[in-house]
Amino acid sequence: MNFHVTSGTPEKQRTAALVVGIYEDEKLSSYAQRIDKASEGYVSRLIKQGDFTGKKGQALLLFALPGVKAERVLLMGCGQKDKVTAKNLRQSWSGAVKALQACGATEAMICPLEAKPKDEELTQWARLIVETAEQALYRYEHTKSKKESLKKPLAKLTLLLDQRSQQPLAEQGIQQGQAIAKGVNLARDLGNLPGNICTPTYLADEARRLAKEYKSLKAKILEQAEMEKLGLGALLAVSRGSRQPPKLITLEYKGAPGKQKPIVLVGKGLTFDAGGISIKPGERMDEMKYDMCGGAGVLGTMQACAELELPLNVIAVVPSSENLPDGAANKPGDVLTSLSGQTIEVLNTDAEGRLILCDALTYSKRYRPDVVIDVATLTGACVIALGAHASGLLSNDQSLAEHLLAAGQTSDDRAWQLPLWDDYQQQLDSNFADMANIGGRGAGTITAACFLARFTEEFRWAHLDIAGTAWLSGKEKGATGRPVPLLTQYLIQRAQEAKTS
């Protein structure tokens, strides 16, 4: 979709559809008031008659409104004025986009709720509009023989502002929104692909494709033989039950001088997880194709970073394999030697994500990182604790944790911090190795992070458990693209700090 910015009065705009917000309790947004005045109270009469209440997500399409040059006016319900949040506005705008798509409008114009928002609010609003529009129009069709037929796709959206001086701020928001939307859609596509297509080799090829598309990106893939020489024993043990060769995928972005320490993003790329010898129940096992959403999210973030040309150095590391049962697969009771030299007793082969991540975290040390952030669909315990709304966050550096929490709030891709206390480490004690790969039923998300913490003592590190936020089940089943918005916002914040320092 193409996005543009213009300024002027709403009633004088020639467009296929003009979108204005309406609050509950018969309250009109500032732009809706202008439309109401131009139409001699048409909108307010509709509301008083009960034809439109302004409830969140409600949409009403009006044709040939008197005194208004737009072909259609779409009233967008925004809920109670004093309770409008970014999440509520996303829901309202998503419903409006679907209404525009249904009516066959190929282009439309949308107004802010208020004529004179603060600078930061205007940029965030423009970004939200773009991200939500792209998300609402997303369709997965890669493995369908028949494509979904649409009347005419919504191809152009113009953001209408009160003053021309506001346009640069909105254009900045559009640029950020388009970059994030591209990254989110890439992560969703990769997550939604079935495991027989999106293999470790496919993920590696996707990294190579990104490197060809963006000159600022450089891809490097470690094959099994190279990993054996280096001693990535934990990652290789997980992959032994699969016929698909494992990969260690790196994608480097250089947007700053070489002396600037890189930010390293590590993403779990387990393209299918049957649990190995500790095999999972059959119910919903198909959703284990989503176990690579950490890796997909990291690749999507790298694309967004390249789109924005951020003045940072960022490196993605994606350990990728399958976890399947086979005569060669690792077994409960096996002891593995990781790249760090530490030994691990495997008590449950279905706790494999931490095994491929620990070698990737150790591998990240060679880049002398400023910070390392790993992203993984790691524990069912996180789904129980936080559900589908917040990702779990644990860190050995409180400043880093606070920056990520702030990025989550700004991007509406929120996280919730859990403790990483030494008290939990004893749950990983083993009589036969330096540690066990699980710590019992209690505090499963925390003990998984405690396991990873043993491989991150030499750098600042944060862990995002996205097991509850990476995909949806049920009627709306599919990958969400999270945490691309959170990670990209964190990188935007770091880039802004770099400019001012």
From Swiss-Prot:
Pfam families xrefs: Peptidase_M17, Peptidase_M17_N
Assigned EC number: 3.4.11.1, 3.4.11.10
Molecular function terms, GO-annotated: manganese ion binding; metalloaminopeptidase activity
Keyword Cytoplasm annotated: yes
Active site (UniProt): 280, 354
Catalytic activity: Release of an N-terminal amino acid, Xaa-|-Yaa-, in which Xaa is preferably Leu, but may be other amino acids including Pro although not Arg or Lys, and Yaa may be Pro. Amino acid amides and methyl esters are also readily hydrolyzed, but rates on arylamides are exceedingly low; Release of an N-terminal amino acid, preferentially leucine, but not glutamic or aspartic acids
Location(s) in or outside the cell: Cytoplasm
Stored InterPro entries: Leucine_aapep/pepB, Macro_dom-like, Peptidase_M17_C, Peptidase_M17_leu_NH2_pept, Peptidase_M17_N
Cofactor note: Binds 2 manganese ions per subunit.
Any one Gene Ontology BP term: proteolysis
Cofactor section: Mn(2+)
Keywords from the UniProt entry: Aminopeptidase, Cytoplasm, Hydrolase, Manganese, Metal-binding, Protease
Positions of Mn(2+) 2 binding: 268, 273, 291, 352
Cellular component, GO annotation: cytoplasm
Binding site for Mn(2+) 1: 273, 350, 352
Function: Presumably involved in the processing and regular turnover of intracellular proteins. Catalyzes the removal of unsubstituted N-terminal amino acids from various peptides.
Membership in a protein family: Belongs to the peptidase M17 family.
Protein's name according to its UniProt entry: Probable cytosol aminopeptidase
Source species of the chain: Nitrosococcus oceani (strain ATCC 19707 / BCRC 17464 / JCM 30415 / NCIMB 11848 / C-107)
